[in-house]
Regions:
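Short beta->alpha junction loops
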Residues: 23-34, 38, 152-159
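Short, well-structured alpha-helical segments in soluble
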Residues: 32-49, 57-60, 162-173
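Venus flytrap/periplasmic-binding-protein-like
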Residues: 68-82, 186, 190-214
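Pocket-lining segment of extracytoplasmic ligand-binding domains
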Residues: 130-199, 205
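Periplasmic-binding protein-like
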Residues: 42-55, 71-73, 121-124, 172-184, ...
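Hydrophobic alpha-helical segments within soluble ligand-binding/sensing domains
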Residues: 78-119, 219-240
Length: 249
């Protein structure tokens, strides 16, 4: 998903500004600590714009500079990611971007529509990801309103994904996985437990679903990145002020 968003971003800029943009693509390889090092390098170089792909990259960029325009993508909830109590759709300052938030109530509806006999739903996610926690809380509320029992099963990183997934499989009739980068990197381990146990998973995005789920209500991450690239074009051309640009979906 993240690679698709990056490619969409690059394609949008290359189409609008052919031969005029130089890209410096640095991958943190799933390590949040690497994000700070990478972003500090960008700031030292005086880049014209930073595209921050996923929450860890966005928070690192926001901490590193208040001057260079920052466009986030693959961010679920900007208010949660940036700890903004009064978020109203526009971050302000030097930050804007796009959100990958799908309709969580519709995802909850999928669980009850596909599995009407399900009584217990395990909510499987990474506790270190604020956006994952946000999605879990929203889906839990939706399911509670339908009379469905839920329980949270949180792993801290890739090291305990398998053990936590096993606990979730032992508990649940259905597992729900939100948009979560750690889960996305460990779909094989998750599938190796859920499939033999006969426990289906409804997922928050297509990449996770293709690895370990049965259904999802998702977005195109390529299109999301492309939209982010279109926003970048407006900023680089001086057509838009990032401080007034609302988050796009």
């Amino acid at each position: 998903a993240l690679d698709a968003a990056t490619q969409g971003f690059i394609d949008a800029l290359n189409e609008a500004l052919p031969g005029q943009v130089t890209f410096e693509n640095k991958n943190a390889s799933g390590e949040a600590n690497n994000c700070g090092t990478i972003v500090n390098g960008f700031v030292s170089e005086g880049v014209d714009l930073i595209m921050a792909n996923a929450t860890a990259a966005l928070t690192a960029a926001a901490s590193a500079t208040a001057d260079i325009p920052i466009l986030g993508t693959s961010i679920t909830a900007y208010g949660v990611a940036l700890d903004l109590d009064d978020f109203d759709g526009t971050v302000g300052g030097n930050i804007s971007g796009t959100s990958d938030l799908a309709d969580l109530s519709q995802q909850a509806d999928m669980i009850t529509e596909w599995f009407p006999e399900a009584k217990k739903v395990a909510l499987l996610f990474c506790s270190a990801k604020p956006n994952s926690s946000y999605q879990i809380q929203e889906v839990a509320t939706c399911l509670a309103n339908k009379g469905i029992e839920t329980k949270e099963f949180a792993f801290t990183d890739s090291n305990d994904v398998a053990s936590v997934t096993q606990s979730a499989a032992d508990y649940a009739d259905v597992v729900y996985l939100p948009t979560d980068n750690i889960a996305a990197s460990n779909t094989e381990a998750i599938a190796n437990i859920l499939v033999p146990a006969g426990v289906p998973a409804i997922c928050g995005e297509e990449g996770i679903c293709s690895g370990c789920g049965v259904a999802t209500l998702s977005i195109s991450y390529y299109d999301l990145g492309y939209t982010t690239g279109e926003m970048a074009v407006k900023i680089l051309n001086g057509e838009s002020d990032i401080s007034t640009m609302p988050i796009e979906y």
